[in-house]
Amino acid sequence: MIKKLLLYIDTSVLNYVFADNVPGDREVTRELFKEIKEERYGAFISDVVIAEVSRAPEQRIKEILGWIEQYNLEVLEVDEEARSLAARYIEAGLIPPKYLDDALHIAIATVNNLDVIVIWNFEHIVKLKTKLGVNGTNMMLGYRTIEIYSPREVVES
């Protein structure tokens, strides 16, 4: 039996569920959640995601929190191990210091042994340099590698 992949859902993915300005990406994102509902994947977010969502306009907060509840996304907590690993990503120049939350997303997924980070952030996360650097750092520190993909690369249909 094939192991169900464990996905870390980044804040950008939750925002794209409601992104009327990019209907193609919105539909791909909704398809991903359909596959999550069908239990093709285990799906997780973190308290960092919740904190980022809380900075959105009130209506968007309600929509996203409702979506999180509807799809039963498990919330992982940032801990000292994840903070330390995130700092290593920043020290290595993989993530700019002003984007600590992005480093935390990767670190939380890594320390919780998830398989894939699903994210729409092409600016500095879904990039070859970042993927290679993160996995090099992870291996050097005794963690397993992690995949970083957009929803378009994850959906099966």
Per-range role (PLM):
Residues 1-45, 54-66, 91-97, 131-134, ...:
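Short, well-structured N-terminal submotif of metal-dependent ribonuclease cores
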Residues 8-9, 44-46, 117-119, 150:
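A structural signal for short, well-ordered beta-strand segments and their strand-loop junctions
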Residues 66-67, 140:
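An acidic/histidine-cluster motif and surrounding catalytic segment
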Residues 74-132, 155:
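Active-site neighborhoods of divalent-metal-dependent phosphate/nucleic-acid chemistry enzymes
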Residues 142-157:
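Short, C-terminally biased terminal segments at protein or domain edges
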